[in-house]
């Protein structure tokens, strides 16, 4: 005989936000959740109202162990739709709700399973009524070799299967039977309370699904639990929500039809901040997972001031460091950054207790080079007189230097020397053979190879220079010094 489908009414049907989101879906969706090979668009604000783990924007994927069909049923429940399940779909949906932190769906599954447990099978009821016959001598029955052995009884408590093998069947009135019944009831009560009081995201010992948002209950501590998680480590948000305990009033079944789950929003810690927020038992886990994201903090005062003093040395505030010169040269700045960091930090750390000796002032910068020569037209100043004279030709238009190969003229000797490179010749050229020389000394050495009788009358070594100047040059600024003719 097939069992009727199970109907789970959603408590979010009267919520205005959920109704609008369900009506607009998939429009205005800011979240895309990938489960298996399927993507489910959703609204992060609606998901955040029922679960801290689901209220994340962007595109992210759920861990292994949740099928797309189960997640679709969970999503329909969140959006205010009633979910109809087959008997075999109740347990996977409850485990998915427990893993993703949807407490209202998990409680609805518990109530549905409790309603089914109130209607036991007739054969099971008959089997439970058989051992109710009292026995006057329980010790004799326990020692009787012909006693009856009962089959295995499987009890499901809080999602866990515990096999209880009863090799002996003592009567209900016996002390052993009473003790066994009391232990079973206590175990069932403890497991149920543990299930109701466990933080969202913890996982029982029977965990069959490798959902990344779950943490195993391990007496070894948080670090061992994180090491045994299958797959890559979860993000900071999922671990943060899984270790944040809920208050006792949040566990009360006060969420009735027409009331949204406001406690999920009110108790939501900041996702983008210090990992694990205010939870204390996960310090080791945080150091194990986010080793590269930690901010090293020390407890003693001298080490604690180190990072602050480094900031103070780079950007000092008035009164925090000894006042130095207003400006430093690049070499002095480098020396200050590399060699005096420790001294500055120590000085800043003990400034309140004892006066720090002032750092010696660097030598003053050399005075600026004097420029006594000024242009009478524009007022521009120069340190050398010939620089001022060359500049003055800009105003007068005088170009005393001329090229012997072309009509090019220049106001500056250096400019004319550069102009010669356009002709591809040296500044000195032999008047007899036309050979070029780069300097006056090389031209003098070259002319010794010619006979003096070949030289024209009135020839001088200066006539080999290709440039001529219309103004007499001083001996100090002459491009070449006059020399005697070679013989």
Swiss-Prot record:
Keywords: DNA-binding, Metal-binding, Nucleus, Repeat, Repressor, Transcription, Transcription regulation, Zinc, Zinc-finger. Signal peptide: none annotated. SMART domains: BTB, ZnF_C2H2. GO terms for molecular function: DNA binding; DNA-binding transcription repressor activity, RNA polymerase II-specific; RNA polymerase II cis-regulatory region sequence-specific DNA binding; zinc ion binding. It is found in: Nucleus. InterPro entries: BTB/POZ_dom (IPR000210), SKP1/BTB/POZ_sf (IPR011333), Znf_C2H2_sf (IPR036236), Znf_C2H2_type (IPR013087). One of its GO terms (cellular component) is nucleoplasm. One of its GO terms (biological process) is regulation of immune system process. Residues 112-206, 220-244, 308-371, 468-487 are annotated as: Disordered. Residues 308-320 have a biased composition (Polar residues). Homodimer (via PTB domain). Interacts with the N-terminal of FANCC. Interacts with ZBTB16. Interacts with GATA3. This is Zinc finger and BTB domain-containing protein 32. The gene is ZBTB32.
């Amino acid at each position: 005989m097939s069992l009727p489908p199970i109907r789970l009414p959603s408590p979010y049907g009267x919520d205005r936000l959920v109704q609008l989101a369900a009506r607009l879906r998939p429009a205005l969706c800011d979240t895309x959740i990938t489960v298996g090979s399927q993507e489910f668009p959703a609204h992060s604000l609606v998901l955040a109202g029922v679960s801290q783990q689901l209220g994340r924007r962007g595109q992210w994927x759920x861990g292994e162990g949740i099928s797309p069909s189960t997640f679709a049923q969970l999503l329909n429940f969140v959006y205010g739709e009633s979910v109809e399940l087959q008997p075999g779909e109740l347990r996977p949906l409850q485990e998915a709700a427990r893993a993703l932190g949807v407490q209202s769906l998990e409680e609805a599954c518990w109530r549905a399973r409790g309603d089914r447990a109130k209607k036991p099978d007739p054969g099971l009821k008959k089997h439970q009524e058989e051992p109710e016959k009292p026995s006057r001598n329980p010790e004799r029955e326990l020692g009787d070799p012909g006693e009856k052995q009962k089959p295995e009884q499987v009890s499901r408590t809080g999602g866990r299967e515990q096999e209880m093998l009863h090799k002996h069947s003592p009567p209900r009135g016996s002390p052993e039977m009473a003790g066994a019944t009391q232990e079973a009831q206590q175990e069932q009560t403890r497991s149920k309370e543990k299930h109701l009081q466990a933080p969202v995201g913890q996982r029982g010992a029977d965990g069959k699904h490798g959902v990344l948002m779950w943490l195993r209950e391990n007496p070894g501590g948080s670090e061992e639990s994180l090491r045994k998680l299958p797959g890559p480590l979860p993000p900071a948000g999922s671990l943060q929500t899984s270790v944040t305990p809920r208050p006792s009033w949040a566990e009360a079944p006060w969420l009735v039809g027409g009331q949204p789950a406001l406690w999920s929003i009110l108790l939501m810690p900041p996702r983008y901040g210090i990992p694990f927020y205010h939870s204390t038992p996960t310090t080791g886990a945080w150091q194990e997972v986010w080793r590269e994201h930690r901010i090293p903090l020390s407890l003693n005062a001298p080490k604690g001031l180190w990072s602050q003093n480094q900031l103070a040395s780079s950007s000092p505030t008035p009164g925090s460091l000894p006042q130095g010169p207003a400006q430093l040269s690049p070499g002095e700045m480098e020396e200050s950054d590399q060699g005096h960091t420790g001294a500055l930090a120590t000085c800043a750390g003990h400034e309140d207790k004892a006066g720090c000796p002032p750092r010696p002032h660097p030598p003053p910068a050399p005075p600026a080079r004097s420029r006594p020569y000024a242009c009478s037209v524009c007022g521009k100043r120069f340190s050398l007189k010939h620089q001022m004279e060359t500049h003055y030709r800009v105003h007068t238009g005088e170009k005393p230097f001329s090229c012997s190969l072309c009509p090019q003229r220049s106001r500056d000797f250096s400019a004319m020397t550069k102009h010669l490179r356009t002709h591809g010749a040296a500044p000195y050229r032999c008047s007899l053979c036309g050979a070029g020389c780069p300097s006056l000394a090389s031209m003098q050495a070259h002319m010794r190879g010619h006979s003096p009788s070949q030289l024209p009358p009135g020839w001088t070594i200066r006539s080999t220079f290709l440039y001529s100047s219309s103004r007499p040059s001083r001996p100090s600024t002459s491009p070449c010094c006059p020399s005697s003719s070679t013989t």
